[in-house]
Amino acid sequence: MLTIALPKGRIGEDSLALFEKIFDTKFEFGKRKLILEAGGFRFMKVRNQDVPTYVYHQAADLGIVGLDVLEEKRLDIMRLLDLGFGRCDICIGIKAEESLDFSKPSYKVATKMENITRDFFSKKAIPVEIIKLYGSIELAPLVGLADMIVDIVETGETMRQNGLKPALKIMESSAFLIANKNSFYQKKAQILHLREQMSKVLYGS
Protein backbone atom coordinates (compact mmCIF):
# COMPACT_ATOMS: atom_id res chain seq x y z
CA MET A 1 0.00 0.00 0.00
CA LEU A 2 1.28 3.46 -0.91
CA THR A 3 0.74 6.26 1.59
CA ILE A 4 0.16 9.65 -0.02
CA ALA A 5 0.11 13.02 1.75
CA LEU A 6 -2.35 15.48 0.23
CA PRO A 7 -2.79 19.15 1.13
CA LYS A 8 -6.11 20.47 2.32
CA GLY A 9 -7.84 22.67 -0.23
CA ARG A 10 -7.94 22.86 -4.01
CA ILE A 11 -4.76 20.92 -4.82
CA GLY A 12 -5.90 18.06 -2.58
CA GLU A 13 -9.34 18.03 -4.21
CA ASP A 14 -7.85 18.10 -7.72
CA SER A 15 -5.50 15.27 -6.74
CA LEU A 16 -8.35 13.03 -5.57
CA ALA A 17 -10.27 13.86 -8.77
CA LEU A 18 -7.23 12.71 -10.75
CA PHE A 19 -7.08 9.42 -8.82
CA GLU A 20 -10.80 8.90 -9.41
CA LYS A 21 -10.26 9.35 -13.14
CA ILE A 22 -7.34 6.91 -13.20
CA PHE A 23 -8.87 4.16 -11.08
CA ASP A 24 -12.60 4.73 -11.68
CA THR A 25 -13.10 4.62 -7.90
CA LYS A 26 -14.61 7.16 -5.51
CA PHE A 27 -11.99 8.67 -3.19
CA GLU A 28 -13.61 10.78 -0.50
CA PHE A 29 -12.52 11.63 3.03
CA GLY A 30 -15.19 11.07 5.68
CA LYS A 31 -16.36 14.07 7.67
CA ARG A 32 -13.48 15.33 9.86
CA LYS A 33 -11.39 12.31 8.83
CA LEU A 34 -7.70 12.87 8.09
CA ILE A 35 -6.96 9.38 6.73
CA LEU A 36 -8.66 7.67 3.79
CA GLU A 37 -7.88 4.08 2.79
CA ALA A 38 -9.27 3.09 -0.59
CA GLY A 39 -8.18 1.47 -3.83
CA GLY A 40 -4.93 0.20 -2.37
CA PHE A 41 -3.86 3.65 -1.15
CA ARG A 42 -3.72 5.40 2.18
CA PHE A 43 -4.30 9.14 1.76
CA MET A 44 -3.49 11.59 4.55
CA LYS A 45 -4.92 15.10 4.63
CA VAL A 46 -2.35 17.54 6.02
CA ARG A 47 -1.53 21.25 5.92
CA ASN A 48 -0.08 22.38 2.62
CA GLN A 49 3.28 23.38 4.12
CA ASP A 50 3.57 20.05 5.97
CA VAL A 51 3.33 17.76 2.92
CA PRO A 52 7.11 17.76 2.22
CA THR A 53 7.82 17.12 5.92
CA TYR A 54 5.62 13.99 6.00
CA VAL A 55 7.30 12.74 2.83
CA TYR A 56 10.85 13.56 3.96
CA HIS A 57 10.40 11.63 7.23
CA GLN A 58 8.74 8.72 5.35
CA ALA A 59 5.45 9.10 7.19
CA ALA A 60 4.19 9.18 3.59
CA ASP A 61 5.73 7.51 0.54
CA LEU A 62 4.42 10.16 -1.83
CA GLY A 63 2.94 13.62 -1.66
CA ILE A 64 1.35 16.22 -3.88
CA VAL A 65 2.22 19.84 -3.21
CA GLY A 66 2.96 23.14 -4.94
CA LEU A 67 6.43 23.90 -6.26
CA ASP A 68 6.47 27.07 -4.14
CA VAL A 69 6.28 24.96 -0.97
CA LEU A 70 9.07 22.68 -2.21
CA GLU A 71 11.31 25.63 -3.02
CA GLU A 72 10.63 27.17 0.37
CA LYS A 73 11.08 23.97 2.42
CA ARG A 74 14.19 22.68 0.59
CA LEU A 75 14.01 19.12 1.88
CA ASP A 76 15.85 16.24 0.21
CA ILE A 77 12.95 14.60 -1.60
CA MET A 78 12.34 13.47 -5.18
CA ARG A 79 10.24 15.46 -7.64
CA LEU A 80 8.59 12.92 -9.93
CA LEU A 81 6.03 14.78 -12.05
CA ASP A 82 4.68 18.27 -12.66
CA LEU A 83 0.93 17.72 -12.48
CA GLY A 84 0.07 21.02 -14.13
CA PHE A 85 -2.80 22.02 -11.83
CA GLY A 86 -2.82 24.37 -8.85
CA ARG A 87 -1.05 26.98 -10.94
CA CYS A 88 -0.11 30.30 -9.38
CA ASP A 89 2.67 32.88 -9.42
CA ILE A 90 4.90 34.17 -6.66
CA CYS A 91 5.00 37.94 -7.10
CA ILE A 92 6.29 41.12 -5.57
CA GLY A 93 3.34 43.29 -4.58
CA ILE A 94 3.46 47.04 -4.04
CA LYS A 95 0.96 49.86 -3.45
CA ALA A 96 -1.23 50.39 -6.51
CA GLU A 97 -0.10 53.99 -6.98
CA GLU A 98 3.63 53.16 -6.78
CA SER A 99 6.18 51.91 -9.30
CA LEU A 100 8.68 49.17 -8.54
CA ASP A 101 11.96 50.92 -7.85
CA PHE A 102 15.14 49.27 -6.59
CA SER A 103 17.17 52.48 -6.25
CA LYS A 104 16.91 52.78 -2.46
CA PRO A 105 19.78 51.50 -0.26
CA SER A 106 17.56 48.80 1.28
CA TYR A 107 13.97 47.58 1.51
CA LYS A 108 11.65 45.91 3.97
CA VAL A 109 9.81 42.95 2.45
CA ALA A 110 6.94 41.15 4.20
CA THR A 111 6.30 37.52 3.24
CA LYS A 112 5.51 34.00 4.36
CA MET A 113 8.23 32.72 2.01
CA GLU A 114 11.56 33.74 3.52
CA ASN A 115 13.83 31.46 1.48
CA ILE A 116 12.30 32.22 -1.92
CA THR A 117 12.35 35.94 -1.12
CA ARG A 118 15.91 35.96 0.20
CA ASP A 119 17.18 34.05 -2.83
CA PHE A 120 15.55 36.41 -5.30
CA PHE A 121 16.91 39.60 -3.76
CA SER A 122 20.31 38.05 -3.07
CA LYS A 123 20.71 37.15 -6.76
CA LYS A 124 19.82 40.75 -7.64
CA ALA A 125 22.27 42.04 -4.98
CA ILE A 126 19.48 44.11 -3.43
CA PRO A 127 19.75 44.54 0.37
CA VAL A 128 16.49 43.65 2.13
CA GLU A 129 15.13 43.10 5.60
CA ILE A 130 12.67 40.22 5.45
CA ILE A 131 9.70 40.44 7.80
CA LYS A 132 8.12 37.03 8.33
CA LEU A 133 4.33 37.09 8.54
CA TYR A 134 1.83 34.23 8.71
CA GLY A 135 -1.21 35.90 7.18
CA SER A 136 -2.77 39.17 5.96
CA ILE A 137 0.46 39.93 4.09
CA GLU A 138 -1.30 42.63 2.04
CA LEU A 139 -1.66 44.78 5.13
CA ALA A 140 2.09 45.32 5.58
CA PRO A 141 2.72 48.06 2.96
CA LEU A 142 -0.52 49.84 3.84
CA VAL A 143 0.50 50.42 7.48
CA GLY A 144 4.19 51.10 6.86
CA LEU A 145 5.46 47.73 8.09
CA ALA A 146 7.09 46.95 4.74
CA ASP A 147 7.90 48.57 1.39
CA MET A 148 6.59 45.58 -0.54
CA ILE A 149 5.40 42.01 -0.16
CA VAL A 150 6.17 38.67 -1.77
CA ASP A 151 3.07 36.49 -1.97
CA ILE A 152 1.14 33.92 -3.99
CA VAL A 153 -0.97 35.41 -6.80
CA GLU A 154 -3.63 33.53 -8.74
CA THR A 155 -5.69 36.34 -10.27
CA GLY A 156 -4.29 39.37 -8.44
CA GLU A 157 -7.76 40.23 -7.15
CA THR A 158 -6.85 39.97 -3.45
CA MET A 159 -4.01 42.45 -3.92
CA ARG A 160 -6.21 44.82 -5.92
CA GLN A 161 -8.97 44.74 -3.31
CA ASN A 162 -6.39 45.77 -0.72
CA GLY A 163 -4.88 48.66 -2.68
CA LEU A 164 -1.89 46.72 -4.00
CA LYS A 165 -0.81 45.38 -7.39
CA PRO A 166 1.48 42.56 -8.56
CA ALA A 167 4.62 44.32 -9.82
CA LEU A 168 7.04 41.51 -10.69
CA LYS A 169 6.77 37.73 -11.02
CA ILE A 170 9.47 35.84 -9.08
CA MET A 171 8.46 32.29 -10.03
CA GLU A 172 5.63 30.13 -11.34
CA SER A 173 4.24 27.26 -9.30
CA SER A 174 2.09 24.20 -9.92
CA ALA A 175 1.43 20.93 -8.11
CA PHE A 176 4.15 18.27 -8.13
CA LEU A 177 4.14 14.57 -7.30
CA ILE A 178 6.99 14.02 -4.82
CA ALA A 179 8.50 10.91 -3.23
CA ASN A 180 10.57 9.92 -0.24
CA LYS A 181 13.91 8.60 -1.53
CA ASN A 182 13.84 5.38 0.51
CA SER A 183 10.22 4.70 -0.42
CA PHE A 184 11.07 5.25 -4.08
CA TYR A 185 13.72 2.54 -4.08
CA GLN A 186 11.70 0.18 -1.87
CA LYS A 187 8.50 0.54 -3.94
CA LYS A 188 9.98 1.64 -7.24
CA ALA A 189 7.78 -0.43 -9.57
CA GLN A 190 4.56 0.70 -7.84
CA ILE A 191 5.57 4.34 -7.78
CA LEU A 192 6.77 4.45 -11.39
CA HIS A 193 3.59 2.73 -12.54
CA LEU A 194 1.48 5.29 -10.69
CA ARG A 195 3.50 8.14 -12.16
CA GLU A 196 2.97 6.68 -15.63
CA GLN A 197 -0.79 6.41 -15.06
CA MET A 198 -0.99 9.99 -13.82
CA SER A 199 1.06 11.30 -16.74
CA LYS A 200 -1.11 9.39 -19.22
CA VAL A 201 -4.34 10.93 -17.90
CA LEU A 202 -2.86 14.42 -17.63
CA TYR A 203 -0.76 14.57 -20.77
CA GLY A 204 -1.68 11.53 -22.84
CA SER A 205 1.80 10.04 -22.43
Curated annotation (Swiss-Prot):
Q: Which reaction does it catalyse?
A: 1-(5-phospho-beta-D-ribosyl)-ATP + diphosphate = 5-phospho-alpha-D-ribose 1-diphosphate + ATP
Question: Where does the protein principally reside?
Answer: cytoplasm
NCBIfam families registered for this protein in UniProt: hisG
- Name the family the entry cites: Belongs to the ATP phosphoribosyltransferase family. Short subfamily.
Q: In which pathway does it act?
A: Amino-acid biosynthesis; L-histidine biosynthesis; L-histidine from 5-phospho-alpha-D-ribose 1-diphosphate: step 1/9
The record's annotation in HAMAP family points to:
HisG_Short (MF_01018)
Q: Membrane spanning segments where?
A: none
Q: Where in the cell is it found?
A: Cytoplasm
- What protein name applies here? ATP phosphoribosyltransferase
The top of its lineage is: Bacteria, Pseudomonadati, Campylobacterota, Epsilonproteobacteria, Nautiliales
Q: Does the keyword Coiled coil apply?
A: no
GO molecular function terms noted in the UniProt entry:
ATP binding; ATP phosphoribosyltransferase activity
- Which top-level enzyme class is recorded in the Swiss-Prot or TrEMBL entry? transferase
Q: Name the gene behind this protein.
A: hisG
As recorded in UniProt, its EC number(s) are: 2.4.2.17
